[in-house]
């Protein structure tokens, strides 16, 4: 199923929006962990400019891809493809970037959007395989 996923600032989890004909544009799930195949990283420049102008967060960045069951065997082929971390900060970048190299990202074969607790604090990470 083709979806777009964004971090929901109010619910503190990922919202999954259907891009399929029947439920197009509707939030179909909220999850702490979302695996995707054939993903594209998207940022609305108009939304980003609004963040910069108003200094207030809004939903304008998301990942589009094919939703995968979390039970999918061999989702991560780490033996052959190293897992990397993606990040996005509208005050620093106009696109998603690799967290280490800071190079812009447009797409990835596999993505895992994950929320976790670390020392009493919630963090979200975007892992990807190029």
Model-derived segments and spans:
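A short, compositionally biased
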Residues: 8-15
